[in-house]
A protein has these predicted regions:
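Short Pro-Cys-Gly-centered "Cys-loop" motif that presents a nucleophilic cysteine in a tight turn
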Residues: 1-188
């Protein structure tokens, strides 16, 4: 009944969730973790991810030992306070505008800056939906993405019609590349 009345097909969650293979070390995993932890901020649920108990960062700040071990591993640290401070800086950026100002940046203003050739801080971009983090298939360093592409070609005994793609020149991505080139705008 639901599918017929809403002109849909499949299960209710069909096409809702996607997967992305992320390089498990370095800049790629930390960038994606920050992007995920900023989901409640992008949704307008909270101003600070520490206030949202259903995200990993909020759980870690609240004292959950499993979440804290995850952040320690992510930051490659042994001291919780150092790891927490470093990750918080990664979330908000040391040179970023005050949080309230950064949240109030509209998509139109963002597009104007991009059109003028200006680059935005990664911390500002992480407050928007970045399609490469959901539709890029593989995200990581160039060597990691090349390795995954070679494994795919070997496993399926065919040549994939894709190649390593650079992330859009909106900011300094720290060497991150993706497997899939996207035709639609990167943000939104």
């Amino acid at each position: 009944w639901f599918n017929k009345s809403h002109r849909r097909y499949g299960t209710l969650w069909a096409e809702r969730f996607k997967s992305l293979l992320v390089e498990p070390t370095g800049r790629a995993i930390e960038t994606v973790a920050a992007y995920i932890d900023l989901n409640p901020v992008r949704a307008g649920l909270v101003d600070d991810p520490k206030d949202y108990r259903f995200c990993g960062y909020g759980e870690a700040v609240a004292g959950n030992p499993d979440a804290q071990r995850g952040l320690l591993s992510l930051r490659n640290e042994t001291d919780w306070s150092t790891a927490q401070a470093g990750y918080r800086l990664a979330l908000f950026g040391t040179a970023a505008a005050p949080r309230d100002h950064a949240v109030s940046v509209t998509p139109e203003a963002l597009q104007q800056v991009v059109a003028s050739g200006g680059k935005l801080p990664l911390t500002t971009l992480l407050r928007y939906r970045i399609r490469h983090f959901t539709d890029g298939a593989v995200l990581g360093s160039q060597a990691f993405v090349q390795q995954q592409l070679a494994a795919y070609r070997t496993l399926h005994h065919r040549r994939a019609r894709t190649a390593v793609r650079l992330m859009p020149a909106l900011t300094d991505w720290g060497g991150l590349v993706t497997l899939r080139g996207l035709r639609k705008p990167a943000l939104g």
